[in-house]
């Protein structure tokens, strides 16, 4: 069945036959070829939102394939929108005609227009198909989104029960922890002030108490309690933070899920799929218009060249021009618009699907975070340990009370057991004494006549108490009551006090057996089944006696009620009998008196019996009840007799009245019985309901336990997967690091060798120069001496270098001891360097991180210093402005002072003028001057005074305005200073926050880039977009080697990181806020945000998520494969232990040894295929002379080589050679490698080696069934050579043995140069020791039984991969000999001999031994027979 594969991000729909896929990776490979998605980035889901499995792949109809790179923030380029099609230019319809009067011209016009319309229909059909394809892609994308959302819901629902259970547990735990944190000191004070019993404290703690009055405090360790109290607030806060963080993350996850579902529903509601059929309808309209034009063209072909036809053609053409052609153009334009609309809708849905997938990835990360936080919260054992000890302090009173109650219970139990045992022993002693007396009496009367003498040994009973408990302190209930009173006087927790009171109440409650005895009395009867098992346990139990006495009182009350009722009935009956016979004169008075006396006596006897019953107990009460019932029946019978007598004498009215009374009494009896039945029924129903409730509760508990166990199983599987993933990561990292260190070490060694060679070359060169200079003139002796000095310097350098090497070794050892003081220093320099490089790797990584941080800090310090300088400049500018304002104020003040001085001067002048005026007036009055001159001067002075007064007024007003302006400037300066200080502090805080935020973004991008590089990805940027590519392992190793060989690898790596970070975020742009210019700051901020946005967070998340999923998939896959391989290995190991090996012989294998043709040499070879020269070392236990084959288990294999040169030595030397040390006991060719096998018989009882037609050991019979397929049918006269005859069997075995002996694998030895070849050439041993070989490839396949027909039921199927066969022989469990007489031989089932092909050549079969492979051996008692199959 074809499977539809839907691609999520492209909307592509593929079909494939699932029969060609055996594993899920094959499907991913096929999808990768079709869609160019890497197989490791493919995720497949079914329509239900679950992961596709290979087992369910053949039943699925649709699967959804996702590219996990899409969910990464930076992989937006993976979703390539489909470009909008070019605008379709509708060509103009043909509208030219050569001759309007010619019908042919009109027909040509119609033809051209028809062809034009046909082209438009074809183009419209293509646009309609493209539109439908776009809508199909939209449908696929929405379906894939639905499956992804369903998968997310399934994942979240899996952890929801665990989260809800954790919420239920966390809230009360936090409350309890808070209570313990706040009140643990109060609980400790309570323990200090609460006295307890010294013996119990010693018993509980196991140590001596030296205090005169021990308290509860002595039960705990005070230091541990104080330490727990100090750690409790921190633990509580940490636990509370974890719980709050989990709650916030979980709420965020659920809110994000609800938002995702709401957005998906919104996307579904506004989906463009409702317009998916518009293009098909529009295409039908276009085709209808074109059909009309085609029909008009066909009609025009039938027109003649008449005026009427020409007019009709012209009219039809005008209709086309006015209606059909514009309509067709309009419809084609609408089709184009539909195509554009569908393409836009598809592109928008694709982009929104990418956003949805990123949202799904975020929620998935929140889900994993919640899961990890749940595990962390469940595993906070340290916090729980702290609170456990504080809880112990809180529960100290209850713990002490529980121990005291247990001591009381154990003491009471011991007393009860001792009392009951002594009572039982005394009673049995009485019975034994009574039996002894009876026996003596019988012996005296009867037994003395016959039989033995008097037997005084009477069987008795001895009671021994075993298993005495450890002596507990002798405490009583009064001690526990006193302890409760002490606690009530102190501020103790009420819940703890209630629990202690409950312990005291439980001491008074009866045991289970006692409760059964109490419940045995029901409805006035005793249920013996409920009485319990032992009657001794009641004796001496005061509580039980008290409860029995209460039941006795209740029964007595019931009895009194019944007796009073009986007395009333008797009285009524007596009165009725007396009143009904007033005229009976013959009734004797004595009878009445007797009846009254009987009645009174019955009353007295009932009272007497009542008193006696109350004194005697329950049994007399029951007998009394029975007696009263009997008397009641007798009275009833008597009343019936009396009524019968009265019926003869009384009237019908009294008779009816008596019957009514009887019926009434019977009715009351029936009501009582019904009440008892109803009570019993209610008891049964209550019991059934109680059982049902218990069953329901038990079922709920079991279901809850099942859920918890399933959750624990899932958690355990997740932990196993995480552990496997971490192990794989560590292993991969260690392998890479080891390779890097090995390469670096090789480079160092090469460099050291190069340096040594270089120094050696220099020495040689200097020596040559010295020799040449010695041969030159004597004038050059100084140069020779200098050269010698240089040689000495070089030698000193060499010695210094050697000393440096020693120092280097010592430095390495010291460095290793400092790096790992606990480790052992290796002796080898290579091992030491490897260990140091391993330690140095971590240090280099840390140094790289610290260098990056130092560079970041340096840049921050520089920018901080520049920012400080700028701030200082701003402050200086502000100070300059303030100084300018102050100078302005000073100038204003100086101006005011000047003006005031001018005003004072003017006032002084005014005063002087006034004085002069007064003087002039005085002079004028005195007549000293002339009137005219004085008048003129007076006027001048008055004018001058007027002007001065005006100037004074104006100056005063100007001074007032200046003072007001000065005051305003002062207020402005103060307000500006306050604002400047506030703004400075505000901007300082803002700058700190901005710096922190910018640096965090910078460091976050830095760490994420490092993470991508460390997990094997390369980050590249092109045209403002970030791309993450996976580095192949070969390139990664090459890069690591290059880095390790270069001493400056760390510098280049840090430089690479700096370049990456420089590409992502410019370092200068980090300090965009340090610009004084607002416009420049805005530009740098925009540039910073643009550069920061180049880091695609979605691509990063998708890459990391994909990497994690790949590792998880590989871990699961390898885990499953390891499990399957381990099981297969166990199975194969178990099977191979019992199978006969025919190649690759090892110790412990089971082998079949067959004799060679030369029996005198004792050569027994192991049956093999392609592995010759394995000979058996003969032992006495093998008894090879009487065997025809031997199945034995190999214990040792010794490889030997034939050396015939030893045989050429003198005879004295050859005779001294031990037989066991002889390397050629079987006369093999020189230089031949052969193997001597020591083997122990695994299954003894192999048959002897008789001749053909003779029997083997009498107790064994071999039944061989040969099934030889595909052999040619012989002709006439060949019946004797049939495989079923003796001759055929003999011939087959001879051929097989000859084929084994003539194997070419045994002829690979070198020729013997000294005649050894001639000696052994004609020897039979040269061919006897050769093993079997496979048949040539040209052998017909039909000759092999494995390629013939089907094997019989007795033959096993042949394998092609296993290299072992089952043992051909199963020995009988018991061999019977002819001399043993009537020994019965057990009949053994057949053991199938399986033939398996060689691994090296599965197509090559052995023809010679095919018949042997199909032979089954069966042992039977009697004789040996061969059956042809």
Curated annotation (Swiss-Prot):
UniProt-listed GO biological process terms: autophagosome assembly; autophagy of mitochondrion; piecemeal microautophagy of the nucleus; protein transport; reticulophagy; ribophagy
A Pfam family assignment = ATG17_like
**Record has Ribonucleoprotein as a keyword:** no
GO molecular function: any one? molecular adaptor activity
Q: Does this entry carry the keyword Transport? A: yes
Q: What happens when the gene is disrupted?
A: Significantly decreases the radial growth of colonies under nutrient-rich conditions. Strongly reduces conidiation.
User: Which region ranges are annotated with the description Disordered?
Assistant: 574-622, 1205-1224, 1333-1405
Q: Which cystines does this chain contain? A: none
Q: Which GO terms describe its cellular component?
A: Atg1/ULK1 kinase complex; phagophore assembly site membrane; vacuolar membrane
Q: Where in the cell is it found?
A: Preautophagosomal structure membrane; Vacuole membrane
Q: Where is the composition biased (Basic and acidic residues)?
A: 606-616, 1384-1398
Ranges of Polar residues composition bias in the record? 575-592, 1206-1215, 1333-1362
Q: Which InterPro entries match?
A: ATG11, Atg11_C, ATG17-like_dom
* Entry superkingdom: Eukaryota
Annotated membrane topology is: Peripheral membrane protein
Instruction: List where this protein forms a coiled coil.
Output: 540-579, 616-808, 842-985, 1106-1135
Q: Keywords in alphabetical order, please.
A: Autophagy, Coiled coil, Membrane, Protein transport, Transport, Vacuole
Quaternary structure, from the entry: Homodimer and potential homooligomers. Interacts with ATG1 kinase and the ATG19 and ATG34 cargo protein transporters. Interacts with ATG9, ATG17 and ATG20.
What exactly does this protein do?
Involved in cytoplasm to vacuole transport (Cvt), pexophagy, mitophagy and nucleophagy. Recruits mitochondria for their selective degradation via autophagy (mitophagy) during starvation, through its interaction with ATG32. Works as scaffold proteins that recruit ATG proteins to the pre-autophagosome (PAS), the site of vesicle/autophagosome formation. Required for ATG9 anterograde transport from the mitochondria to the PAS. Also recruits the ATG19-prAPE1 complex to the PAS. Required for the Cvt vesicles completion.
Q: Which family does it belong to?
A: Belongs to the ATG11 family.
Q: What name does UniProt use for this protein?
A: Autophagy-related protein 11
Q: From which source organism is this entry?
A: Gibberella zeae (strain ATCC MYA-4620 / CBS 123657 / FGSC 9075 / NRRL 31084 / PH-1)
- By which gene is this protein encoded? ATG11
């Amino acid at each position: 069945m074809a499977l539809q594969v839907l691609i999520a991000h492209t909307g592509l729909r593929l079909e494939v036959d699932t029969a060609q896929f055996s594993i899920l990776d094959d499907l991913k490979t096929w999808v990768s070829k079709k869609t160019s998605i890497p197989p490791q980035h493919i995720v497949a889901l079914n329509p239900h939102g679950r992961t596709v499995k290979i087992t369910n792949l053949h039943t699925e109809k649709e699967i959804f394939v996702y590219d996990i790179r899409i969910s990464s923030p930076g992989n937006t380029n993976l979703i390539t929108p489909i470009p909008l099609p070019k605008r379709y230019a509708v060509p103009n319809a043909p509208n030219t005609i050569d001759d309007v009067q010619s019908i042919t011209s009109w027909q040509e016009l119609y033809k051209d227009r028809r062809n034009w319309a046909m082209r438009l229909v074809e183009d419209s059909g293509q646009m309609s198909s493209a539109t439908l394809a776009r809508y199909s892609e939209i449908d696929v994308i929405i379906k894939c989104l639905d499956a992804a959302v369903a998968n997310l819901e399934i994942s979240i629902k899996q952890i929801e029960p665990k989260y809800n259970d954790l919420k239920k547990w966390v809230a009360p735990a936090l409350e309890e922890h808070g209570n313990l944190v706040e009140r643990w000191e109060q609980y400790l004070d309570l323990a200090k002030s609460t006295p307890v019993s010294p013996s119990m404290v010693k018993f509980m703690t196991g140590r001596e108490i030296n205090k005169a009055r021990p308290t509860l405090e002595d039960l705990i360790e005070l230091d541990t309690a104080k330490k727990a109290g100090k750690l409790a607030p921190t633990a509580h806060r940490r636990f509370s933070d974890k719980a709050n963080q989990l709650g916030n993350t979980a709420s965020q996850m659920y809110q994000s899920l609800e938002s995702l579902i709401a957005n998906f529903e919104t996307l579904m509601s506004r989906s463009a799929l409702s317009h998916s059929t518009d293009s098909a309808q529009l295409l039908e309209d276009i085709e209808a218009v074109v059909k009309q034009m085609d029909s008009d063209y066909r009609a025009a072909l039938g027109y003649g060249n008449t005026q009427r036809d020409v007019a009709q053609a012209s009219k039809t053409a005008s209709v086309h021009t006015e209606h059909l052609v514009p309509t067709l153009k309009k419809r084609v334009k609408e089709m184009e618009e539909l195509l554009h609309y569908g393409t836009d809708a598809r592109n928008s849905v694709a982009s929104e699907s990418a956003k949805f997938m990123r949202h799904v990835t975020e929620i998935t990360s929140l889900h994993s975070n919640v899961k990890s936080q749940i595990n962390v919260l469940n595993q906070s054992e340290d916090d729980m340990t702290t609170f456990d000890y504080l809880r112990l302090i809180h529960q100290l009173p209850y713990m002490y009370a529980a121990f005291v109650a247990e001591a009381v219970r154990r003491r009471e139990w011991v007393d009860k057991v001792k009392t009951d045992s002594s009572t039982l022993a005394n009673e049995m002693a009485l019975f034994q004494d009574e039996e002894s007396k009876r026996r003596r009496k019988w012996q005296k009367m009867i037994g003395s006549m016959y039989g033995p003498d008097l037997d005084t040994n009477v069987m008795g009973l001895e009671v021994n108490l075993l298993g005495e408990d450890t002596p507990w302190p002798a405490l009583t209930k009064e001690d526990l009551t006193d302890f409760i009173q002490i606690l009530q006087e102190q501020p103790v927790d009420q819940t703890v006090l209630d629990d202690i009171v409950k312990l005291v109440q439980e001491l008074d409650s009866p045991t289970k057996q006692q409760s059964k005895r109490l419940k045995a009395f029901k409805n006035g009867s005793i249920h013996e089944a409920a009485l319990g098992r032992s009657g001794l346990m009641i004796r001496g139990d005061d509580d039980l006696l008290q409860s029995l006495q209460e039941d006795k009182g209740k029964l007595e009350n019931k009895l009194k009620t019944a007796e009073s009722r009986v007395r009333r009935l008797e009285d009524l009956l007596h009165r009725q009998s007396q009143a009904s016979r007033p005229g009976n004169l013959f009734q004797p008075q004595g009878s009445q008196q007797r009846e009254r006396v009987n009645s009174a006596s019955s009353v007295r006897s009932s009272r007497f019996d009542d008193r006696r019953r109350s004194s005697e107990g329950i049994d007399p009460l029951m007998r009394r009840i029975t007696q009263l019932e009997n008397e009641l029946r007798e009275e009833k019978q008597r009343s019936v007799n009396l009524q019968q007598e009265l019926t003869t004498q009384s009237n019908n009215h009294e008779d009816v009245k008596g019957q009514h009374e009887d019926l009434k009494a019977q009715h009351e009896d029936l009501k009582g019985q019904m009440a008892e039945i109803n009570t019993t029924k209610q008891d049964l129903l209550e019991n059934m309901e109680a059982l049902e409730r218990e069953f329901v509760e038990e079922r709920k508990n079991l279901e809850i336990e099942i859920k918890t166990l399933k959750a624990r199983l899932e958690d355990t599987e997740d932990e196993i997967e995480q552990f496997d993933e971490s192990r794989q990561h560590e292993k991969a990292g260690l392998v890479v690091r080891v390779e890097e260190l090995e390469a670096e070490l090789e480079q160092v060694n090469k460099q050291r060798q190069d340096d040594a060679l270089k120094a050696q070359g220099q020495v040689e060169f200097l020596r040559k120069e010295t020799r040449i200079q010695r041969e030159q003139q004597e004038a050059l002796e100084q140069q020779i001496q200098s050269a010698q000095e240089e040689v000495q310097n070089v030698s000193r350098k060499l010695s210094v270098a050697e000393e440096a090497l020693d120092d280097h070794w010592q430095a390495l050892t010291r460095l290793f001891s400092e790096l790992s003081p606990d480790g052992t220093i290796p002796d080898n320099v290579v091992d030491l360097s490897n260990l140091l490089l391993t330690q140095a790797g971590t240090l280099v990584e840390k140094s790289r991180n610290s260098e990056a941080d130092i560079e970041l800090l340096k840049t921050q310090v520089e920018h901080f210093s520049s920012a400080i300088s700028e701030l200082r400049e701003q402050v200086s500018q502000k100070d300059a402005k303030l100084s300018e304002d102050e100078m302005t104020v000073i100038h204003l003040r100086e101006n005011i002072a000047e003006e005031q001085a001018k005003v004072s001067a003017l006032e002084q002048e005014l005063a002087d003028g006034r004085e002069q005026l007064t003087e002039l007036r005085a002079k004028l009055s005195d007549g000293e001057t002339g009137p005219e001159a004085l008048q003129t001067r007076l006027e001048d002075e008055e004018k001058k005074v007027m002007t001065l007064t005006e100037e004074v007024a104006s100056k005063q007003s100007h001074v007032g305005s200046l003072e007001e302006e000065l005051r305003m400037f002062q207020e402005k300066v103060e307000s500006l200073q306050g604002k400047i200080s506030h703004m400075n502090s505000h901007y300082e805080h803002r700058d700190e926050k901005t710096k922190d935020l910018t640096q965090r973004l910078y460091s976050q991008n830095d760490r994420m880039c490092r993470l991508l590089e460390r997990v094997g990805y390369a980050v590249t940027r092109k045209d403002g977009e970030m791309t993450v590519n996976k580095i192949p392992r070969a390139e990664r190793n090459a890069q690591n080697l290059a880095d390790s060989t270069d001493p400056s690898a760390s510098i280049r790596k840090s430089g690479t990181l700096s370049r990456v970070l420089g590409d992502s975020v410019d370092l200068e742009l980090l300090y965009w806020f340090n610009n004084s210019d607002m416009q420049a700051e805005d530009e740098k901020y925009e540039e910073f945000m643009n550069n920061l946005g180049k880091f695609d967070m979605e691509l990063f998340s998708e890459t990391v998520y994909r990497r994690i999923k790949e590792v998880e998939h590989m871990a699961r896959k390898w885990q499953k494969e390891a499990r399957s391989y381990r099981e297969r290995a166990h199975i194969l190991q178990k099977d191979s232990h019992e199978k006969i090996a025919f190649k690759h012989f090892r110790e412990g294998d089971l082998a079949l040894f067959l004799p060679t043709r030369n029996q005198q040499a004792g050569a027994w070879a192991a049956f093999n295929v392609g592995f010759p020269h394995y000979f058996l070392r003969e032992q006495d236990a093998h008894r090879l002379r009487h065997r025809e084959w031997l199945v034995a288990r190999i214990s040792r294999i010794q490889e030997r080589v034939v050396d015939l040169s030893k045989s050429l030595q003198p005879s004295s030397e050859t005779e001294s050679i031990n037989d066991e040390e002889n390397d050629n006991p079987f006369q093999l060719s020189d230089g031949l490698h052969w193997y001597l096998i020591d083997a122990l018989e695994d299954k003894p009882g192999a048959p002897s080696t008789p001749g053909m037609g003779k029997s083997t050991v009498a107790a064994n019979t071999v039944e061989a069934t040969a099934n030889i397929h595909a052999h040619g049918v012989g002709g006439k006269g060949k019946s004797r050579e049939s495989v079923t005859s003796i001759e055929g069997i003999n011939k087959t075995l001879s051929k097989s043995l000859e084929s084994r002996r003539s194997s070419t694998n045994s002829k690979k030895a070198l020729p013997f140069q000294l005649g050894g070849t001639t000696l052994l050439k004609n020897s039979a041993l040269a061919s006897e020791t050769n093993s079997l070989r496979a048949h040539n490839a040209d052998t017909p396949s039909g000759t092999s039984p494995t390629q013939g027909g089907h094997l019989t039921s007795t033959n096993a199927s042949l394998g092609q991969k296993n290299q072992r066969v089952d043992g051909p022989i199963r020995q009988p469990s018991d061999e019977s000999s002819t001399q043993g007489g009537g020994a019965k031989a057990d009949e053994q089932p057949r053991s199938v001999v399986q033939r398996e092909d060689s691994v090296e050549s599965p197509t090559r079969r052995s023809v010679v031994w095919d018949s042997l492979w199909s032979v089954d051996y069966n042992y039977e008692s009697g004789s040996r027979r061969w059956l042809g199959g």
